[in-house]
């Protein structure tokens, strides 16, 4: 199964697959509104503003699995992200990224891009996965990695 066949739900409740993003460079991120890394939403939006026309899509998936840092409902999350960080990149409904209820997209991502010491589990909010235009996962980055640090890698993928 390719990543593009994964079923997701937008933050406004629309069911879809990732097929509309085929042929694009993707950065898939588990987000949270009350996290020490929440300010990364600003950098994510800056990357999106700069490179969306060249084929970058940033996909945000709110997650409440880490210290209850995303307790709100989807409408609250969307309003927070838009009001405080000007987020216009696609946001999706809240998901689990680990455990028996983990969303199939994150099961797929963690099976194909392991973390430190070969672990599958996502350790915290704002773990980032980069997917190339062919749907191959080419990188997994920790929450400590600022999105802007990935700009050179993104540009190289966009140029392919």
Curated annotation (Swiss-Prot):
Q: Which CDD domains has this protein been placed in?
A: GSH_Peroxidase
**Any idea of its EC number?**
1.-.-.-
Q: PROSITE patterns from the xrefs?
A: GLUTATHIONE_PEROXID_1, GLUTATHIONE_PEROXID_2, GLUTATHIONE_PEROXID_3
Q: Name one GO molecular function term.
A: peroxidase activity
Q: Name one Pfam family in it.
A: GSHPx
Gene Ontology biological process terms in this record: cellular response to oxidative stress
Catalytic residues, per the record, are 35
InterPro entries from the entry?
A: Glutathione_peroxidase (IPR000889), GPX_AS (IPR029759), GPX_CS (IPR029760), Thioredoxin-like_sf (IPR036249)
Alphabetized, the UniProt keywords read: Oxidoreductase, Peroxidase
The text of the family note is: Belongs to the glutathione peroxidase family.
Indicate what this protein is called per its UniProt record: Glutathione peroxidase homolog BsaA
Q: Which gene encodes it?
A: bsaA
């Amino acid at each position: 199964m390719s990543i593009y066949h994964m079923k997701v739900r937008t933050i406004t409740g629309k069911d879809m697959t990732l097929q509309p993003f085929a042929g694009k460079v993707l950065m898939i991120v588990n987000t949270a509104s009350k996290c020490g890394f929440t300010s990364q939403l600003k950098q994510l939006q800056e990357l999106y503003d700069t490179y969306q026309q060249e084929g970058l899509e940033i996909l945000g998936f709110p997650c409440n699995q880490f210290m209850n840092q995303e307790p709100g409902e989807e409408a609250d999350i969307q309003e927070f992200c838009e009001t405080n960080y000007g987020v216009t990149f696609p946001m999706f409904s809240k998901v689990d990224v680990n455990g028996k209820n983990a969303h199939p997209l994150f099961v797929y991502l963690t099976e194909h891009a392991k973390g430190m010491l070969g672990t599958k589990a996502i350790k915290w909010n704002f773990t980032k996965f980069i997917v190339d235009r062919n749907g191959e996962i080419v990188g997994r980055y920790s929450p400590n990695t600022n999105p802007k640090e990935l700009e050179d890698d993104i540009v190289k993928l966009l140029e392919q």
